[in-house]
Amino acid sequence: MQRFFEANPDYFRIVNGEGPRPDEARTEFTDLPPAGMPYRKMSLLGFYDDAGTLIAVATIVADFIVEHVWHIGLFIVATALHGSGVAASLYALLERSMIDQGARWLRLGVVQGSTRAERFWQRCGYVQVRERGPVAMGQKSNLLRVMAKPLAGGTIAEYLALVERDRPGSP
């Protein structure tokens, strides 16, 4: 996974202001949500092509803060595959899996100004529910667009009633 991160540094440059750290992959296994943000399970997923090459990585947090809210912490697709439709296909599989496991709402944070990512998540049906920040990330301080997507008949209003921290204007 470290080689994958080093071969695809764009995400890290945009988010952290520098390429992946030498221990970047290891930290994906040890970084946990902050205290006071309960969750049921955290998963690190790798997606491979037919030749066995790692082409994407995702981290998912199940029942994040409240039951049925799942958080996508990371979703990186190999730079060479950008614009090919692979990211949308992989995301569709990931979303289906989360629904099958009980997700009713999905949430994520996108660095404001990361235009490609912002457009991708909007095309996937996510809407901004608030801004958070500035948040220190590596060598940068970023504003985050907190985005959510209701599933299985859920609504954004129901989501915001459950997840107080994502309500506009909350601390």
Regions found by a protein language model. Give the residues of each.
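Helix-turn-helix
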Residues: 117
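Short loop/turn motifs at secondary-structure junctions
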Residues: 71, 102-104, 143
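Conserved GNAT acetyl-CoA-binding A-motif
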Residues: 98-109
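Short amphipathic helical patch at the helix-1/turn junction of helix-turn-helix
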Residues: 57, 111-112
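Conserved catalytic-core motifs of GNAT/GCN5-like acyltransferases
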Residues: 107-111, 122, 127-145
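Acetyl-CoA-dependent GNAT
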Residues: 3-82, 91-93, 97, 134, ...
